[in-house]
């Protein structure tokens, strides 16, 4: 069994949980000395420690710094695109290749059905997203979620297919950035991303983009132009990672915490700036604590957004999408 991943700020909580677990085992074992200890007394100690654990858990996760949210977004147990696809949809059929160079495993996509029995909603959708690996072998296979030009061209091919057949597009963003290797540059990495921005702005079907983990720079926005932008509570979205920003400004990664604060890259920050539309709440402690709950929450929000978008005609969707992205940012004009 793989060792439990504990982030640095989680260590005090982990230590208390370990102590609590030991006390529960001790109580069940019956090995305590009945002459000096009572079962009721031990139960009282356990209940007190349980309350302390819950209090500390809330204190930690309700007061996360921006850098701590970056750490949670990168948690290796966090659900990835395929996890969400299998938890939220049915009848997923993966589609491969860009029909020009090859099939990039860092981006996956295909047709699936999103439905809710309670409301009667049922809609075939095109789901596209970055996919990371869980271990060294799978990370090499997935290129650590860093897409090549053929990955973005595959994504665009699937989007245009969805447009042709009138299917909404859902993208799940989770990448440390587009692959920066020279071979990717030679095959037109910048052009592939730029082409996606241009084409996604004009897609005549609803497009919903969700940042589920890391949203780094062009690698993220390459599948990130949509009618609605949703963002998981403990994800991040920025033009640059905190480490890279730190290395540029301070010539060292040691200032990554300060960089994260300056970048304002959390869901709360971006909602306040009007970059995203909604925050997807996560279970206390992160999406990896209760993946099924997280997937259910996201699914409900996707269905809610789709119901509104499907009522709009193609021209309205395109006009509103372009206006949405055109209004982002601040223009400063130099005096003549």
Curated annotation (Swiss-Prot):
Catalytic activity of the protein: N(6)-carboxybiotinyl-L-lysyl-[protein] + acetyl-CoA = N(6)-biotinyl-L-lysyl-[protein] + malonyl-CoA
Annotated GO MF terms: acetyl-CoA carboxylase activity; ATP binding; carboxyl- or carbamoyltransferase activity
Protein EC: 2.1.3.15
Alphabetically ordered keywords of this record: ATP-binding, Cytoplasm, Fatty acid biosynthesis, Fatty acid metabolism, Lipid biosynthesis, Lipid metabolism, Nucleotide-binding, Transferase
Annotated localization: Cytoplasm
Ranges that cross the membrane: none
Gene Ontology annotations of biological process type: fatty acid biosynthetic process; malonyl-CoA biosynthetic process
Metabolic or biological pathway: Lipid metabolism; malonyl-CoA biosynthesis; malonyl-CoA from acetyl-CoA: step 1/1
Main location as per UniProt: cytoplasm
Domain CoA carboxyltransferase C-terminal per the UniProt entry, residue ranges: 48-308
A Pfam family: ACCA
Enzyme class: transferase
One Gene Ontology CC term in the entry: acetyl-CoA carboxylase complex
Highest taxon in the source lineage: Bacteria
Function per UniProt: Component of the acetyl coenzyme A carboxylase (ACC) complex. First, biotin carboxylase catalyzes the carboxylation of biotin on its carrier protein (BCCP) and then the CO(2) group is transferred by the carboxyltransferase to acetyl-CoA to form malonyl-CoA.
The protein's assembly and partners: Acetyl-CoA carboxylase is a heterohexamer composed of biotin carboxyl carrier protein (AccB), biotin carboxylase (AccC) and two subunits each of ACCase subunit alpha (AccA) and ACCase subunit beta (AccD).
UniProt record similarity statement: Belongs to the AccA family.
This protein's name: Acetyl-coenzyme A carboxylase carboxyl transferase subunit alpha
Organism per entry: Chlorobaculum parvum (strain DSM 263 / NCIMB 8327) (Chlorobium vibrioforme subsp. thiosulfatophilum)
